Design a protein with these regions (language model features):
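Positively charged n-region of N-terminal signal peptides that target proteins for export
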Residues: 1-4
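N-terminal leader/targeting and pre-domain segments
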Residues: 17-37, 126-129
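Typically the conserved alpha-helix immediately C-terminal to a functionally engaged Cys/Sec
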Residues: 53-68
Length: 129
């Protein structure tokens, strides 16, 4: 049984570290995107979080594919930040990692915590158009 727990721990540790996690949030770029009325996706993460890595994979897949349900993903600005950066987290009232926010211009149109299901994330992005 102990080996099983070690194996599970190693699996989640690998999953959490398999994605490059870095803060890409920039207040000036965010403000510019808002003033231009763009769709803005913001995700929060923390270093050891496996579900954060899964959510980032879904968002990166959508971006890499270039199209998301008949829209170009490059029409959407994407930012991420480490939830331990309390200045950014507090500015969006984010308390937990794996929080996903979608803005249409200055209006927040979607918020979820822990969502990693590709179909639901894609649906939220499509609904924000």
């Amino acid at each position: 049984m102990k080996k099983f727990y070690i194996l599970i721990f190693c699996f989640f540790a690998f999953a959490a570290n398999s994605m490059e996690k870095k803060t890409t949030f920039d207040k000036d770029l965010f403000s510019k995107a808002q003033s231009e009325g763009k769709i803005i996706v913001i995700s929060s993460w923390i270093e050891y979080c496996g579900s954060c890595a899964n959510q980032m994979k879904v968002l990166q897949k959508a971006k890499k594919e270039g199209e998301l349900l008949d829209i170009k993903f490059d029409n959407i600005e994407y930012f991420s930040f480490d939830v331990t950066n309390r200045d950014i987290a507090n500015s969006f009232d984010v308390l937990y990692q794996t929080t996903l926010l979608i803005f249409k211009g200055e209006t927040e149109v979607y918020r979820s915590i822990g969502e990693t299901t590709e179909d639901l994330i894609y649906e939220a992005l499509k609904a924000s158009i």
